[in-house]
Amino acid sequence: MSQIAILSVNHQLAPVEVREKVAFTPDKLTQALSDLHGIYGIYACIILSTCNRVEIYVNSDNENPKEVLSNYLAKIHNITRDRINPYLNYFEDNEALTHVCNVATGLDSLVLGEPQILGQLKNAYHMAKEAKTLNKLLEKLFQHAFSTAKKVRTDTQIGVSPVSIAYCSVKLSEKIFECLSEQTVLLIGAGEMIELCAQYLNKKKVSNMIIANRTIENAQKIANLYQAQSIGLKQFSSVIHKADIIISSTAASVPIIGKGLIESALKKRKHKPIFMLDIAIPRDIEPEVGQLDDIYLYTIDDLEQVINDNIGNREKEKNLAQEIIIKQNQVFNQWLKVLPNEQLVRSYRSNANLIKNKLLEKAIKQIKHSGDYENIIRKFADQLTNKLLHLPSKNIKQTSTDNLSQCEGCIPNIKK
C-alpha cells in the first residue's frame, strides 16, 4: 500500500556545511524531480530546498522509502551515505502529515512562526506541478498544509512579533555597528530574504545601500523601493571595499566571495572592520574569510542566539497552533480513509460507461435497420440494468449477515 514519506536534512541536526552539500539549486531542481519520479515505486514527489532545510516529500509503495530517498540524495549530490546519515530525519504517514504542517506554519523553522517558509513551500509545490511529478494524494497533502498554515496565521498571534531571518540579520549587525544609518551596506542577491533585509535596513535609516544581483533588473526593483543603488553581480567586487556591512543570499552553487578579494578590500579600507553575514545555502562566502582580522563573518547558524532573544512572544502561541494542526489533520485522515472508496467508485463508473456505450452502439444500429423503436429501447434498458447490477448482486449474495446492514444502507439511494 502506498504511503506518504518525507526525508529531511534541516537546521535542527545538520550544520550549514552539511546543508549546503545537499542543497538543490533552482536550475537543477526540475531534473532532480524527474530523476526522483523515475525511481520505481515513487508515484509523486516534491523537493523543498531552502537555507535551513532540504526536504523530499513522496508518495511511495517502496518497502523501505527511507533507504531509497537517502540513496537518491547521496547519489545526486555525489556524496557518501556516511556523510549524511547522522543528519537525516525521516517521517511517514501520520508523522509525515504533522511534519509538513509544522513546516508550513513555521513551527519547525529556525525562526518560530516565520512566514517565508510557506512561500517557499508553495514554490516547491508549483515547481513539482510544472514538472508533472504530483498525484492526487500529494496535491491534497500540500493543499491541506497550506490551508492549515492559513488557519494558524488567522487564529493565533504566532506571526505578530517581527522575528525573521532578515530581521535577525539586521539585529546582529547592530551588535557590531551601533549606528547603522552611518554605514554603507552591500546586499548581494535579489530574493525575498534580501528584499526583507533592505526593508529593515531602510527602517534603520540606512541611506547608502547597494543591491548587487546577476539579473540587474531584479536588483533595480528592490533599489527603487528603498532609494538604493543597483549593480550587476560582476561589478560588486569593485565596490566591496566601500561596504561596512555585507549580507549575501544568492543561489550560486559555489562561493562568490573569496579570501583574496576581502584581503584586497581590507587594504583599501585601511583595515576598517566589515560585518559579513552569509545566509545563502550553499554558502556565498568562503569560510576562510572569517580568519582575517577586522572581519566579522557569520552564517545563518550564528543567528540562533539573536532569534532566541526575540522569540518569547511567539512561543506562547505555539501550543495553540499545534492544537489547530491536530484538528485539521483529523479531517485529512478522514479523507485518506475514504480515498480507496473514491478510486473504486471511479473504476466502477468507468466500467459502467464502457458497458453503456457498447449497448448503446448496438441499439442505434438496430434502430437504423428496424422501425420497432419501443422494443429496442426496452431491450436496451433491460440489458443495461442486468449488466450493471450483475456484479453488485453477486457480491451482496456472498456478503455475510454481519456486513449486510452496510449494504442495505446504500440500497434506498438507488431509488433516487
Swiss-Prot record:
Pathway: Porphyrin-containing compound metabolism; protoporphyrin-IX biosynthesis; 5-aminolevulinate from L-glutamyl-tRNA(Glu): step 1/2. One of its GO terms (molecular function) is glutamyl-tRNA reductase activity. InterPro entries: 4pyrrol_synth_GluRdtase, 4pyrrol_synth_GluRdtase_dimer, 4pyrrol_synth_GluRdtase_N, GluRdtase_CS, GluRdtase_dimer_dom_sf, GluRdtase_N_sf, NAD(P)-bd_dom_sf, Shikm_DH/Glu-tRNA_Rdtase. Pfam families: GlutR_dimer (PF00745), GlutR_N (PF05201), Shikimate_DH (PF01488). Its EC number is 1.2.1.70. Signal peptide: none annotated. The keyword NADP applies. The record marks 99 as: Important for activity. GO terms for biological process: protoporphyrinogen IX biosynthetic process from glutamate. Belongs to the glutamyl-tRNA reductase family. Possesses an unusual extended V-shaped dimeric structure with each monomer consisting of three distinct domains arranged along a curved 'spinal' alpha-helix. The N-terminal catalytic domain specifically recognizes the glutamate moiety of the substrate. The second domain is the NADPH-binding domain, and the third C-terminal domain is responsible for dimerization. Catalyzes the NADPH-dependent reduction of glutamyl-tRNA(Glu) to glutamate 1-semialdehyde (GSA). This is Glutamyl-tRNA reductase.
